[in-house]
């Protein structure tokens, strides 16, 4: 393969597995070799992370992306400057699929933490990603699972989990949906100590066993006293669920 084709192939790789790369850097990657670069992209933990001190220098009131404009600038800065492009690209991919917004969540730091979760788990199994999304305070609030109680279920999270995030319409029944919602009762959010007297409270996932429905549930042909993680275990074994 000619050097020009090598450059073109490497540029294509970085457009797909990242956000492009400066022309002068392509020469070094070509010299390293395509297969070696792919392995490097697939192991972001071997590359340095963005130092938050750089962001504090640019935004003295940074405080971990505490308002939407800084929240957005934080992420764009990381996309441009990361040494882990595939990790950042996967965070964007999962954010697009598991979309939440400050228009409802109204907690920019929590949205930033959710994006950080996508960075951490973006290259893991789909099961692990679904579990982390289900425990994400931003998603819990976005799809109202904090209002999903034993004896008074809210189906929003269960419906999105089955319809949009895994099986798709036609591959589950309304009874499956209701029983999935029952399995996620007690999965809620709890506020933590605020950053400062005027700041938003950080959130954390909280499981309230006293609010969980422990009754028998039938889900996709399986019967048992399922909790949320067991529902996800069943979902990821279904042929209709995409493989990642």
Describe the function of each predicted region.
Residues 40-42, 56-57, 71-75, 107-244:
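Active-site substrate-binding loop specific to GH73 endo-beta-N-acetylglucosaminidase modules
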Residues 7-17, 48-52, 63-66, 152-156, ...:
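Short, compositionally biased low-complexity segments
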Residues 4-8, 20, 31-35, 70, ...:
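Low-complexity, intrinsically disordered regions enriched in charged/polar residues
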Residues 21-121:
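N-terminal accessory alpha/beta regions
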Residues 2-6, 10-23, 238, 242:
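Flexible, low-complexity segments enriched for small/polar residues
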């Amino acid at each position: 393969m000619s050097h020009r084709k090598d450059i073109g192939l490497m540029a294509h790789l970085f457009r797909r597995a990242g956000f492009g790369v400066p022309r002068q850097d392509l020469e070094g990657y070509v010299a390293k070799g395509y297969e070696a670069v792919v392995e490097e992209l697939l192991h972001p933990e071997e590359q340095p992370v963005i130092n938050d001190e750089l962001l504090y220098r640019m935004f003295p009131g940074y405080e971990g992306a505490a308002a939407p404009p800084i929240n957005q600038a934080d992420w764009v800065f990381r996309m441009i400057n990361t040494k882990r492009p595939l990790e950042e690209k996967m965070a964007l991919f999962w954010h697009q699929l598991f979309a939440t917004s400050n228009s409802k969540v109204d907690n920019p730091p929590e949205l930033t933490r959710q994006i950080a979760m996508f960075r951490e788990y973006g290259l893991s199994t789909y099961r692990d990603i679904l579990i982390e999304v289900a425990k994400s305070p931003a998603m819990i609030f976005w799809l109202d699972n904090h209002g999903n109680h034993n004896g008074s279920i809210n189906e929003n999270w269960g419906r999105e989990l089955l319809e949009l995030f895994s099986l798709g319409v036609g591959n589950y029944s309304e009874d499956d949906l209701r029983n999935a919602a029952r399995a996620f009762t007690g999965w809620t959010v709890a506020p933590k100590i605020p950053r400062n007297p005027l700041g938003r409270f950080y959130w954390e996932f909280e499981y309230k066993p006293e609010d969980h429905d422990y009754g028998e549930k039938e889900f996709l042909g399986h019967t048992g006293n399922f909790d949320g993680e067991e529902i996800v275990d069943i979902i990821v074994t279904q042929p209709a669920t995409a493989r990642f």
